[in-house]
């Protein structure tokens, strides 16, 4: 099975770091990490190499990578809590639980074309970031493997 690696997103992440106006507003990026990124950014060639360049004892590799993707998707420190849940799959015997989704404390997405128009503006803004992440993944995958993948509106939850 084909997979993508961090290096497949190297150019996109490099671009997002170069064009970010204020890295400190990005979730998980502290002023110290922002300064480190800005100081080392002129040397940026490839993402894995850049992670090694800025890694230090107070920064884990995972945190650095996560902060880079948060920059790519413009996830700010003050983002609201996710106001919806998305069903990706379920067991057939559990599908009856979906009839209770009207009573849920947050919106449960099963059919995007039907559910997204019902979202409030905050949820739609956050969902747009989900779509961007999915679309970028799909685009990078298609470019690397010369295959197409369905977009988020073209597939339903998997029933096992």
List the predicted regions and their residue ranges:
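Non-catalytic terminal extensions that flank enzyme cores
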Residues: 1-160
């Amino acid at each position: 099975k084909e997979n993508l690696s961090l290096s497949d997103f190297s150019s996109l992440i490099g671009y997002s770091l170069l064009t970010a106006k204020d890295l400190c507003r990005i979730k998980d990026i502290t002023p110290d990490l922002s300064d480190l990124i800005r100081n080392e950014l002129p040397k940026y060639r490839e993402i894995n190499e850049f992670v090694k360049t800025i890694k230090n004892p107070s920064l884990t590799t995972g945190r650095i990578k996560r902060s880079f993707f948060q920059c790519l998707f413009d996830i700010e420190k003050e983002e609201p809590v996710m106001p919806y849940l998305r069903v990706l799959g379920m067991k057939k015997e559990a599908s009856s639980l979906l009839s209770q989704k009207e009573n849920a404390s947050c919106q449960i997405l099963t059919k995007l074309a039907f559910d997204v128009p019902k979202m409030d503006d905050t949820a739609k803004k956050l969902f747009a970031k989900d779509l961007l992440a999915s679309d970028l993944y799909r685009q990078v995958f298609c470019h690397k493997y010369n295959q197409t993948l369905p977009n988020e509106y073209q597939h339903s939850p998997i029933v096992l």
